[in-house]
Amino acid sequence: MKKSILITLMISLSLLIAACGNGNTASNNGNNEEANNDTSSTGTFTIGVIPAQTEGAMEGAMDKLQSILTDELGRDVEVEVYPDYNGVVEAMNYEKIDMAYFGPLSYVIANDKSGAKAIITQLIDGEPFYHSYIITHSDNPWNSLEELLENSQDVNFAFGDPNSTSGSLIPSIELQDRGVYQSDDEHEFASVRFTGSHDATALAVQNQQVEAGAIDSAIFNQLVESGKIDGEQIRTIWESDKLFQYPWAVHQNTDEETIEALQSAFLAIEDQEVLDAFGATGFTEASNEDYESIRQAALKQGLIEE
């Protein structure tokens, strides 16, 4: 009998200890959840940047931008230039970054894949627009795209990154409409290459490694103004219609307080090195609707689905 009572007491004590342990575990889980939430709002804020120019050309400016945003947001900010446009799209898709600097096309793709939300774009002389240029060396005889394409089989042509709007999407549609380009494997040129960035395309044309190339007008103008490219050696032979400028987009779950703080910080940026890295003169607010024309172009090319 005593033995039975002792066993009953031991079982009761074990259950009591287990219950207390579960209570502590629940409490600890709650604390961990709170800690995780705190980290999401005050931990390092990560920004991925497409290589609009080669990484070395952007490094100093990105360090400055990182410092500016760290001060304005009151939290650590880390800015990283990715080796290609698609890397930034995938980083947003897999939640490796909180914000991204996209080209219009890469933004449309990211919005389609992960719900990325445009909140800022850049200004060029007070306007949020730019163009796609097709350029050639001034030693060449062509003064227009029509003249260039008369003997397209003798032309080595350069695009930028495959996911660039002005360096690939828009000029490729123009060349398709003119019947000389379907893809990098099917075309009427001597060769087609992708340089990976706008400054690399400009240098390829200037150094006569290719006869013509597609480039962002704002970055081209900035390269000339900075002396990185000799404007006397380059001729623009085609210009697209206006394109809405490159967006800065956040993860779809970003809270409004953070969005407003980011918008305020970007609108206040006046540092010339930072602005020059993007070929910009300032920043302004943006929305998803600003990129509807690019979305339609991406649908036409089969880059996204309806």
Residue map of PLM features:
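A conserved helix-loop-strand patch within extracytoplasmic ligand-binding domains
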Residues: 123-180
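A ligand-binding cleft/hinge motif common to bilobed small-molecule-binding domains
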Residues: 101-114, 172-177, 206-207, 211-231
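Periplasmic-binding protein-like
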Residues: 50-51, 123-133, 228-264, 276, ...
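Extracytoplasmic "Venus flytrap"
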Residues: 36-62, 283
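C-terminal motif of bacterial Sec signal peptides marking the signal peptidase cleavage site
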Residues: 15-19
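Ligand-binding cleft/hinge of the Venus flytrap
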Residues: 64-74, 166-194, 222-229, 299-304
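Ligand-binding clefts/hinges and TM-proximal coupling segments of bilobed small-molecule sensing domains
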Residues: 22-28, 150, 156-174, 261-306
